[in-house]
Curated annotation (Swiss-Prot):
Name of encoding gene: US17
Matching InterPro entries: Bax_inhibitor_1-related
Localization of this protein: Membrane
Pfam families given in the database record: Bax1-I (PF01027)
Gene Ontology cellular-component terms listed: membrane
Listed transmembrane segments: 55-75, 77-97, 110-130, 138-158, 164-184, 193-213, 226-246
Glycosylation sites: N287
Membrane topology of this protein: Multi-pass membrane protein
Family statement drawn from the similarity comment of this UniProt entry: Belongs to the cytomegalovirus US12 family.
Name by which UniProt lists this protein: Uncharacterized protein HVLF1
Domain of life: Viruses
Keywords, alphabetical: Glycoprotein, Membrane, Transmembrane, Transmembrane helix
Amino acid sequence: MSPNSEATGTAWAPPPPRPSRGVIMISSVSTNDVRRFLLCMRVYSTVAVQGTCTFLLCLGLVLAFPHLKGTVFLCCTGFMPPLSLMVPTICLALLHGKRDEGSFTSPPSPGLLTIYSVLTTLSVIVASACSSSTLVTFSGLLACVLFSLCSCVTGLAGHNHRRWQVIVTLFVIGVIAFLIALYLQPVPLGHKLFLGYYAMALSFMLVVTVFDTTRLFEIAWSEADLLTLCLYENLVYLYLLILILFTTEDSLDKLIAWMTWLSSRATGATNAASISGCDLLREVQRNLTRTMA
């Protein structure tokens, strides 16, 4: 019996044991934490399934029809990969337009989200048809790595403003260093401008992906489908930008050949009646290469 318990007449009970360091008490995990974990699992599993199916369809099309990049006219002009960015750009603008003062308005119907997803997937497949299987595979893997890196950065920084400042500073330094290195490369000015433009677009999309990932800590369960589609759009946008970066030089040469072909048709210098569009563009490109050499 404790002296205090004798004075008060109550039975003395030993204090509860303190948990040792490194031991997580089950009671410290709240219902909100469990719900947030399930929400993250739902979002990322859906994005993973969508992204995997899209990349497999792209790779399957390229392997099944490897001649498309040499026979489809838009592929021969170099327009197809940049044109494919229009669909995810419009979809992302519409999806982010659903936000109102920092929170989503009423979530769109599942049918509308499905339409967005199908249109984006088709644009990615069409753009991949103008590339090789090696480029499709490498671009898809690199896009997944960058997307995962954005998720890791978001989880590492959390709500710590100091960490965000360090991450943003390192990111800006990396972008500036890349642009300086690109400027010092012995390549034509047109190639530098195209590469610099798409590199800046890729940097911007990384920022957008990190921003969308931070919303995992804010949204409700009913808004998960909308955020899932946003992250999927970000993933395929990264893939398309990487694909364009690896094919910029070839696309620029094709574009110059196409413009030369148009000018020759306008002046009547070329008889295109007996030659297909792609064959004619390849002939013009070979002539330009010999002239520049």
